[in-house]
Amino acid sequence: MRLVQLSRHSIAFPSPEGALREPNGLLALGGDLSPARLLMAYQRGIFPWFSPGAPILWWSPDPRAVLWPESLHISRSMKRFHKRSPYRVTMNYAFGQVIEGCASDREEGTWITRGVVEAYHRLHELGHAHSIEVWHEDELVGGMYGVAQGTLFCGESMFSRMENASKTALLVFCEEFISHGGKLIDCQVLNDHTASLGACEIPRRDYLNYLNQMRLGRLPNNFWVPRCLFSPQK
């Protein structure tokens, strides 16, 4: 196993099975964040993650963190909160604001640089990257974004500026995703937060098998059309 240097003249990636064990999943470096390369990466179970000012690093960890939408864990307190939620939830209304929110609301710093913001915004304009927005009145207070691969959604990041805002985004999205044929959410690497929401780890080979099947699936043509998913009860 060795770290592969990508060429700017080819969007090809090495097999994820060749990724390093330590650091877990590091597969390649270099290349660029062009839409074609990003889409090729997601189709192969690979994602970018790197520090500002450093070379682009590409990862495919083993095990892989995933969330089966029907297994989303909602605490009793969250269920009570959602019943009287003051939030309105939309899809693809404000992709730029959501990714900017994910970039700026990180006390420990962020990998979401200006170049990353621009790259995913291009994916959004091409219909591949999508956002869920949580509004309190007319203020954006939380949200999440990711990349669609058929009936699998690759979650990238979320943010919250008010109580339970990001959890609301995930809850409403999971309900909508399941009801329209969505199968699986990729969480990349397990952490305490995603584990508390019901995410689990599966072997990389299993994730790649699911990906190869699900990316060929189709949600309804109008699923990603900008629309309101949830409104507070009056």
From Swiss-Prot:
<dbReference type="Pfam" id="PF03588">
    <property type="entry name" value="Leu_Phe_trans"/>
</dbReference>
<dbReference type="InterPro" id="IPR042221">
    <property type="entry name" value="Leu/Phe-tRNA_Trfase_N"/>
</dbReference>
<dbReference type="InterPro" id="IPR042203">
    <property type="entry name" value="Leu/Phe-tRNA_Trfase_C"/>
</dbReference>
<comment type="similarity">
    <text>Belongs to the L/F-transferase family.</text>
</comment>
<dbReference type="InterPro" id="IPR016181">
    <property type="entry name" value="Acyl_CoA_acyltransferase"/>
</dbReference>
<dbReference type="InterPro" id="IPR004616">
    <property type="entry name" value="Leu/Phe-tRNA_Trfase"/>
</dbReference>
<keyword id="KW-0963">Cytoplasm</keyword>
<dbReference type="GO" id="GO:0005737">
    <property type="term" value="C:cytoplasm"/>
</dbReference>
<keyword id="KW-0012">Acyltransferase</keyword>
<comment type="function">
    <text>Functions in the N-end rule pathway of protein degradation where it conjugates Leu, Phe and, less efficiently, Met from aminoacyl-tRNAs to the N-termini of proteins containing an N-terminal arginine or lysine.</text>
</comment>
<dbReference type="GO" id="GO:0008914">
    <property type="term" value="F:leucyl-tRNA--protein transferase activity"/>
</dbReference>
<dbReference type="GO" id="GO:0030163">
    <property type="term" value="P:protein catabolic process"/>
</dbReference>
<keyword id="KW-0808">Transferase</keyword>
<protein>
    <recommendedName>
        <fullName>Leucyl/phenylalanyl-tRNA--protein transferase</fullName>
        <ecNumber>2.3.2.6</ecNumber>
    </recommendedName>
</protein>
